[in-house]
Amino acid sequence: MPADRGVPRRDGERIPETGKRGTMTNTQKELLQALRCFMQGDEEYHLPERFSQLKELCDLAAMHKILAIIYEMIRRDAVLLLEENAPLAAKWKKSAIAEVMLQVQRTAGFLELYQKLQKEGVHPLVVKGLICRSFYEKSDFRISADEDLLLRKEEFETFDRILLEEGYQRQALDLNNLPYEIPYRNPRNQVYIELHFLLFAEGEGAYGHLNQEFAGAFDRCICEQIEGVDIKTLSPTDHMFYLICHSFKHFLHSGFGIRQVCDMVMMAKHYTTRIDWREIQDKLAQLRMDTFFSALAKIGREYLGCSWEKTGYVDDTQECVDCMPLLVDLLEGGVYGGSTMARRHSANMTLEAARRGKKATASSVWSSLFPGVSYMKGHYVWLCKYPWLLPAAWVMRLFGYAADRKHTEDQSSLEIGNKRVELLRKYHVID
């Protein structure tokens, strides 16, 4: 198939070529095309005959944590059978198989744990992860690093006891002052759980207010059956709105990857009119997130094959929205915008701009270079015990950034930060 012909959709249409303003690479285009075929349930995708960026495609898939998905779609392709590509193809196959096997193990381990929690009268809501995976025909190819649970605080004591009895490990806790997020890891089956009492960090000025939008979520929850196990989760409207808000949160940090857009599309296709789209659109408009989601929806329609009309979602403004800058940003950023240290550091500028609701200032530049102790604790755990060593952490951070710059050609965190602040303005998040 010639490179400029694209790949046909099931309805005979083709992915549109990027316009003169588009800046996607050929590798990024092929990733999207293979990904869309996977989401549609196709058996395979064929790369262009003279495709020579196989290594770049593999690296990009790894950056977005969809290595197994892309390999599954192209494993029969002639490009992978070429002698010069044999070593890479073998390595890719090995990694893909390992990822899928680990996901199967993690899913089984989590379902076993969830049933034990239910028997003890503990009913956390499963958010994203397992639920999103279930929307895909080959669910274990859509890997998850963890399972997010939303729990009522009054159930924590029993929840914690059960997990510790099952061999899960966690950090020491002050039971009178529980943190926003409590991670548990089981070294036996590699299940990793992030427990939450709220969906967003309450003290974060840029998005902590989003918690109020989910008041009563437990009262509205539904039950999904996955592999024979009844799983409690958010209602279709709450869950779809949460996926948008979760992506928005990471957009305000250092970004998010294409997989989150895929999950939105798959959830919309699964629940269709069970989602109250009018309620979501009204909330998005009030929160200045409507243009942001219109761009995501346009990405879903033009590049991931989503017919939004069939889901009940109607957006008359979508045609006027330029989704390309957002698409390029999320493709370059990888999962949660973690593609480079410089990009991760830039998060402080976008967060500060969102808090202030305006363009980056000297204070946001300072925040990027020298973030507060609450942010730094996430990267230097010893600050939890020795917060007065914050200046030492700043020095280590700057040296780490300098080392990263020696091995990359990435823009500085300030340049990336300024560019991403402009994205916030473009999508009307800030003035």
Language model segments and positions:
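Conserved NTP-donor binding/palm subdomain of two-metal-ion nucleotidyltransferases/polymerases, i.e.
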Residues: 24-145, 151-431
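Short, Lys/Arg-enriched N-terminal segments with co-localized hydrophobic residues
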Residues: 13-23
